[in-house]
Amino acid sequence: MIAFLKGAVFERRPDSIIIDVNGVGYEVNIHSRLFPRLPQRGEPILIHTFLQVLENEFKLFGFLDQDELRLFKTLLTVSGIGSKGALAVLSTMEPLVFYRAIASQDEKTLVRIPGVGKKTAQRMIFELQDKVPELKLVEVEKEQRPLLDELMEALEILGYSRSEVLPAIMDLNRNKQLGNIVEENIKLVLKAKAQEMRR
């Protein structure tokens, strides 16, 4: 599994980028919203990747942040949505906008995505409504999201899944018990989980 590539931009296109990693050029498929944010030719880049293994070929897909990579992987679990459809979603809207549309069952927003009709929009809502932990973050204030994301990533490193810790994090955040120090927040989350298990 290729988790990321770190190198220099060799060539940029609206739908792909070639990255020079120690003299080896990797072609990485991207969504169109990513293109304007790419570094220029010869500049350094670190890109998070997903490797898709098909019958006759390997395809790399690249993202500048983990949120977009997570959404891409999640979309691949929806019936009838392949890599092309997942890239179409990310080309059309940011992850938070998509999650908000799923959470509010907003078909009108979803059918703006190229290739997504009413039935596909309904299928996305049905299949993702209960299994995407990020939906609970939709109503979180924008300035709080980096803190919560950092906390969740730290807990993932400790071996906890997002779905396992997100309810406790959201409860603590709702009650304004979380501070700005990640280590202290981890202790609060683990304490809350321990109390929950004793109930």
Swiss-Prot record:
Chain spans, region Domain I: 1-64
GO molecular function: ATP binding; four-way junction DNA binding; four-way junction helicase activity
Region (Domain III): 148-199
Principal cellular location given in the protein's record: cytoplasm
The name this protein goes by in its record: Holliday junction branch migration complex subunit RuvA
Keywords: Cytoplasm, DNA damage, DNA recombination, DNA repair, DNA-binding
Protein family (similarity comment): Belongs to the RuvA family.
Gene Ontology annotations of biological process type: DNA recombination; DNA repair
A GO CC term attached to the entry: Holliday junction helicase complex
Subunit: Homotetramer. Forms an RuvA(8)-RuvB(12)-Holliday junction (HJ) complex. HJ DNA is sandwiched between 2 RuvA tetramers; dsDNA enters through RuvA and exits via RuvB. An RuvB hexamer assembles on each DNA strand where it exits the tetramer. Each RuvB hexamer is contacted by two RuvA subunits (via domain III) on 2 adjacent RuvB subunits; this complex drives branch migration. In the full resolvosome a probable DNA-RuvA(4)-RuvB(12)-RuvC(2) complex forms which resolves the HJ.
Organism: Syntrophomonas wolfei subsp. wolfei (strain DSM 2245B / Goettingen)
Region described as Flexible linker: spans on this chain: 144-148
Record remark: domains: Has three domains with a flexible linker between the domains II and III and assumes an 'L' shape. Domain III is highly mobile and contacts RuvB.
Gene3D superfamilies in alphabetical order: 5' to 3' exonuclease, C-terminal subdomain, Nucleic acid-binding proteins
Function summary: The RuvA-RuvB-RuvC complex processes Holliday junction (HJ) DNA during genetic recombination and DNA repair, while the RuvA-RuvB complex plays an important role in the rescue of blocked DNA replication forks via replication fork reversal (RFR). RuvA specifically binds to HJ cruciform DNA, conferring on it an open structure. The RuvB hexamer acts as an ATP-dependent pump, pulling dsDNA into and through the RuvAB complex. HJ branch migration allows RuvC to scan DNA until it finds its consensus sequence, where it cleaves and resolves the cruciform DNA.
Superkingdom of origin organism: Bacteria
Region Domain II, residue ranges: 65-143
Pfam families in the record: HHH_5 (PF14520), RuvA_N (PF01330)
Localization annotation: Cytoplasm
